[in-house]
Swiss-Prot record:
GO CC field: cytoplasm
GO BP terms, alphabetized: alkaloid metabolic process; methylation
Localisation per UniProt entry: Cytoplasm
Recorded catalytic activity of this chain's protein: 7-methylxanthine + S-adenosyl-L-methionine = theobromine + S-adenosyl-L-homocysteine + H(+)
Binding site for Mg(2+): N178, D260, F262, N263
Cofactor(s) needed by this chain: Mg(2+)
Name of the protein this chain belongs to: Monomethylxanthine methyltransferase 1
Function: Involved in the biosynthesis of caffeine. Catalyzes the conversion of 7-methylxanthine (7mX) to theobromine and of paraxanthine to caffeine. Has a 5-fold preference for 7mX.
Organism listed in the record: Coffea arabica (Arabian coffee)
InterPro entries in alphabetical order: MeTrfase_7, MeTrfase_capping, SAM-dependent_MTases_sf
Broad EC category: transferase
Keywords (A to Z) from UniProt: Alkaloid metabolism, Cytoplasm, Magnesium, Metal-binding, Methyltransferase, S-adenosyl-L-methionine, Transferase
UniProt pathway annotation: Alkaloid biosynthesis
Originating gene: MXMT1
GO molecular function list: caffeine synthase activity; metal ion binding
Amino acid sequence: MELQEVLHMNEGEGDTSYAKNASYNLALAKVKPFLEQCIRELLRANLPNINKCIKVADLGCASGPNTLLTVRDIVQSIDKVGQEEKNELERPTIQIFLNDLFQNDFNSVFKLLPSFYRKLEKENGRKIGSCLISAMPGSFYGRLFPEESMHFLHSCYSVHWLSQVPSGLVIELGIGANKGSIYSSKGCRPPVQKAYLDQFTKDFTTFLRIHSKELFSRGRMLLTCICKVDEFDEPNPLDLLDMAINDLIVEGLLEEEKLDSFNIPFFTPSAEEVKCIVEEEGSCEILYLETFKAHYDAAFSIDDDYPVRSHEQIKAEYVASLIRSVYEPILASHFGEAIMPDLFHRLAKHAAKVLHMGKGCYNNLIISLAKKPEKSDV
C-alpha cells in the first residue's frame, strides 16, 4: 500500500475519529501571538494586491474542527492587525487554501463551513463571501500554487512528517536496523538517527525551495512542529506507541519481526538542525525561532468532583484516543486493524503512568520565515 494512502487522520465522526478527538490545543494557543506578529510584518511589507485579497494556505491542515479553528485564528489575526495598523478602511478579502494529502477527510471540513461562515459574520463582522475557503489536495513536498501567488503559508504539526521512510534503513542497514522502535527515538543507533536526519534534511529543503517560489517576495511562512531539545526530553506520543507495541510483543500478541520491519516517516528535529537547513537552502531568512512545551492533555477538562486517580485515568484515555486518531491508519496498515484496540489500551496505561509522575509534555518548535527579496526588489 502506498504511504500517501494511509498517511491521514482517522476519518468520519466516530469515537476514534480525529474530528471527535481533536480540540483547540495548547500548541495552537501558543502559536497565536506569533501568528499575529507574522501577519503584522506581512501587512507592513506591502506585498502585491495584499490590501485587496490576502492569499493564505494551511499546509497539512488535517480534518475536523481543529482545521477551522486554525483558519479562525488566521482570519482574526488579519482583522485585528489590520485594524490596529489602520491599513485600509475596508477589510481585504481573505482567500484560504486548505492543503493535505488526497486521502484527507476534507468532507468533514466542508460540512462545517456554513456554520463557520455564519459565526465569522456574527463574531468578526466578516460578511459571507469576504473569506473564501477551498481545498488544495496534494503533497506539500510538491508544487501546489503558481509562482509568486501567495502571501502567507502556515503549517502546524505537519513538517515533521517525512515524504517517505528513510531509504537508508533498508538499503544500507537492512531490515530490523531500528530494533525496538518505530521511529528515531533517543535510544536508537546513530546510523538510524542519521538516516532519519538525512531524509528530513532532504524533505525540508524541498519544502522550502518549492514553497518559497510560490510566495511573493517578502512573503511569510509560519511553521510549527514537534521537536527534540535534549536527552532529558519527556516521552512524546511516538515514545508511548513504542512502549505499547513492545508490551504486545512481550505478551506474545505481536511478533517482534513486525516491529523491526516497521518505521514511521516521522522525525523530531532540533532547533539547530532546522536553523542549519534553512540557512543552507537560502531562499528564506529566519525572523524568529523558539521552542515551547505543550502538555498531552492541555485541551482536556474534567469535573473536579472526580477522584484524582479517576482524573488521571480519564485523561490517559483521552490522550490514547487522540494519539489513536492521528496514527491508527498507518499503524493498522502494517500491524493489522484487529490489534489496534489492544495497542491503544496499553498506550493508555503508559500515558497514565507518565501523567501520574507529573510528566507528559512534549517539545514544539515554531519558526517564522520571510522570503528573501530578489535583487531587483532590493
